[in-house]
Every structure is written in structure tokens, then in C-alpha cells.
Amino acid sequence: MPCRLLHQRETRSGGPRGPRHSAPTGPGWHNAPTLQSWEESHAPSRDPRDHQGSVEDTSLGGDAPADGVSPSVPPLQGLGKAAGPGGTGQAECQVVVATHRANLKPWDGRAAPLGKRTEEGRLSTSSCASVSRNKPDSVPQGDPVWPPESTGPALCAGEETEPQSSEGLAWGPWAQPWAPSLCPSQTGTASTASPQRASRLALQGPPGTILSLSSSSPCLPPSHCDPGAASSWAGLQSLKLLLQVSFQGAADGCSLRDANTNRKGPMHGSDFPPRLCLHSMSLWGSWGSRPPSPAHSREVAS
């Protein structure tokens, strides 16, 4: 299923608003928070606008005001369709992905894809990835990701369902079940939390953030790590290529944020320590009809 259009941004007069405006507030944010069942989230889209579009006007942001995200950002909201038929306003989609060392296999064909290039060179938005949440009915107001500092292993795995098979680039939950006991807390100890139900959820939020990764404490020495630790680090290396290709280098200098050090840098795994349990990932984009700029295309090619 494609990532559905989440909202239609409008001016106070009711007309469509372009993608370069600041994050909307008030009536421009439609749709009350909603969780879809797994079956509903896999239902085929009936709106061709959900399938097409290219990344436009996106740049790295973060969850702090210093990174350009206003603290007055409205609450994150749930999956929904853009208001009104035939609208032309920009729609944005954020995908928050629960990841774990045991399932970092970006090229696994069983995964739900985030997107793939079409023959015309545009990006076709695909399935909204699955989210395992330890807060069943709410998310922190105005926060683009669940901060591990306040929630511990915020997005550890619980129950999982076989994702929909798909062609193209893949990133998401995997077919094998995850054991919650494998996901370490901030102190590196095993989580004793009961299994959490995995739900498919897309969230709205301020435009601008390409990727935000939060991770737990490193596992030192390596001999104390779970068997999946090595594959986790390999998966993080592959994530760079995956995002560069699937998002066509939409932002110059796409960056990773290390939540433990608050460090940001180019999307190269060697710039960051091999964190072992990735709590959350958020992808933001303004989906429009304009193709990527030549500079962005060159970034991908390089």
C-alpha cells in the first residue's frame, strides 16, 4: 500500500499552500489520530495520486528548535487521506519505522518498501512501514520521534506479521518474529516489557526531516553482543545506499543524527559508532510532481 496523503495544507482563505511554507497549524491539519489495522493498511490504494510523486524541497531537520523545528508544532497525527477530492495542495508523509539488530536487512525482498523509482524517474511512494510502539494511544506532542531518553527502548519489536511481498527497494519489518528480550534498554540490559503489537502507522509533522535515527548504548566489548550485532551494523551501512537511491538524494548532505551524542553528519556509517539497537527512524518529505534537480541526481550517481 502506498503511503497515503496525510493532509492538505491550506491558507486561512482556504486555498492550497505551497511546500516551502512553515509547518501548518490549526485547521490546516486534518484527520484525527487514527490507527489502521494490518489488513486495512495493506488494502490497495484507489487514488493514483497516492502512487506518484517525487521528493521536493526536503532538507535535514531534527527534533530540536535549533534544527528548525518549531516547538509549537501541532501534535503528530495518524494515517488519513488529504481533505477534499481533487485537491492540489502539497501533501507530506512521515514514516516511522521500528528497527532492531535482528531485522536490519535492507535488501530483503519480504520487506515493505518505502519507495522505488519509476520508469519516468519519479519516486513512487509505497508501503508505509510498520511501527511497534510501547505507547498504545499517544505520541509525544510535537516530537518527530519517540526519544529513547524518556522511553527506554522506544520501538522494540513485539508481535509481527508477514509483510506484503513487493519488488523494488525494501526497508521495513521482516517476516521472522522478534523477541522483545533481545532489544536492550539504554543501560544495555534486556527489556522485560511484554510484547507490543505491531501497527502500521504514518504520522504527520513538520516538513524537512529526511532521517532521524535514535539508538541505544553501544555494546562493549563486542563479545558481549548478541549474534545479530554484526548484521545490524552491516544493515546500517546499507541504509545509506538505500536512502540515497529511494529518495534520489533529495537533500544535499543527507545526514544521520546520533541521538546519544546529538551528532549529525553525512550519511556514511563510518561517521557513527556501531549502535546496536535502532529505536526509531522517521522519514519526511514533500511529495510533488517536480522531478529531482540535476544536483540531486548527481549525488545519487556518485
Curated annotation (Swiss-Prot):
Domain of life: Eukaryota
Protein name (Swiss-Prot/TrEMBL): Uncharacterized protein FLJ46757
Region annotation Disordered: where it falls in the sequence: 1-167, 180-199
Biased composition (Basic and acidic residues): 39-54
Amino acid composition bias (Polar residues), ranges on this chain: 123-133, 183-197
